[in-house]
Amino acid sequence: MLNINIEKQFSQLQLKVNTQLPLQGVTAVFGRSGAGKTSLVNLLGGLTTPDKGEISLGDTLLFKHKTVNLPPEKRRIGYVFQEARLFPHYSVKGNLTYGMRHKTPELFDKVVSLLGIEKLLSRYPSTLSGGEKQRVAIGRALLTSPQMLLMDEPLASLDLPRKRELLPYLQTLAQELKLPIVYVSHSLDEILQLADHMLVLHQGKMISQGPLTQVWNSEQMRPWVPLQELSSLLSARIADRHPDYPMTRLLMDDGNQLWVSGQLPPTHKQLKVRIQANHVSVCTEEPKGSSIRNLLRGKIKELYPSDNGEQIQLKIALGKDELWANITPWARDELQLIPGKAIYAQIKGVTMTQMDIAESH
C-alpha cells in the first residue's frame, strides 16, 4: 500500500491527507482547481516537504517527520508533468536513456513499443507535436525503473486532437504495466477511461476515496459535479451483438441489460458504462410500445433536491450498482416517488458513445 498521513501549510491552502492507496492500477486524484491535487503529488514525489506526518511506499519509508526524508532521486518514483520538460539538445533517444538505472535493451524496446515512438528516436523535441513530446516524457519516466508513477494532468496542455492521440497510449500503459500510477486530473472523461480507484480532494482535505465506481456514484461527488454533468457508472459485460442492427447488448450483474450503439469488440473484461443523469427518465409501470431500448428495473434509494430547487436528483439501486436520474419536483409528486419504491429507468441507447464505455483493468 501507499500509506499517506501528512500535513502541509501552503500560503493559501492547508493540505491534510490520511489514507492508503493500492499499489496496483491507476488511482485518479480529482478535485477543483486549487483543491491541492498537484501539491499532494509533489509531496509524494519529494519535490515538497510535509510539515509533519509520514509517507511509505510498500516497505520503503519515504518520509517521517524529523527523521527520514528521501530526496526525489532516491524514491524510485517517476514523475510526468503537465509540460513534457524534455532536454532540447538531446534527441528523443537521448532523452529516453537519460536517467536509466539499468541500460537494458529489453526494457527500452518494450517502453518504446508501448508508446509507439520507434520512428521518433532520432528526432529532437523542437520537431515533435505536443502529444509526441508527452509520450517521450512518459517513456523517460518509465525507463528510470520506478516503483510508482506520478502523472500530473499530462493531457492538460494538449488540444482535443492531441488528447485523443495520447489517451489510447495511456490506456495501454494502465493495462500492460504492473506499476501503480497516481493520476491527477479534473477531467471525468480521462478518469473514466483510465482509473481503477479515485481520491477526491476539496480545499486540501480528502472527502472520498475508494474504487472508481463506488466514489463516482457516491453522494460526496454530487456537490463537485455540475447538475447537467451528473452521471453514474454501471458495471456490465458484453453479451452479444444484434444480428440486424449496429448495437451491442451488455449484461449487468442483476440481470438488467443495456443496448449501446455500435458493435463493440469482444472482451471478457468487465466494462464501466457511464450514464448521464439527464438521459434517464423513470416510470412506475412497465411501458409498452416505446422507442427506448433500455428499460432497467430498480428501486429508489434516495431523493436529493438541487440547490435551486428546480430539479430532484434521484438515486436508483440496481442490484450492487446505482443510477442517478434528474427529474422535476412535479414528476416526483405526481408519481409519488419515495425511497424503496420499485420503478423502471429508461435510457436511450444512442446517448451512450465510445467515450462512455471503458474496460476495467
Swiss-Prot record:
Where in or outside the cell? Cell inner membrane
Which of UniProt's keywords are assigned here?
Answer: ATP-binding, Cell inner membrane, Cell membrane, Membrane, Molybdenum, Nucleotide-binding, Translocase, Transport
- Tell me the residue numbers annotated for binding ATP: G31, R32, S33, G34, A35, G36, K37, T38
Gene3D superfamilies, per this entry? 2.40.50.100, P-loop containing nucleotide triphosphate hydrolases
Catalyzed reactions: molybdate(out) + ATP + H2O = molybdate(in) + ADP + phosphate + H(+)
Q: Which NCBIfam families match?
A: modC_ABC, PRK11144.1
Per UniProt, subunit arrangement is: The complex is composed of two ATP-binding proteins (ModC), two transmembrane proteins (ModB) and a solute-binding protein (ModA).
This chain's protein is named: Molybdenum import ATP-binding protein ModC
Identify the taxonomic lineage of the organism of origin: Bacteria, Pseudomonadati, Pseudomonadota, Gammaproteobacteria, Alteromonadales
The gene behind this protein is modC
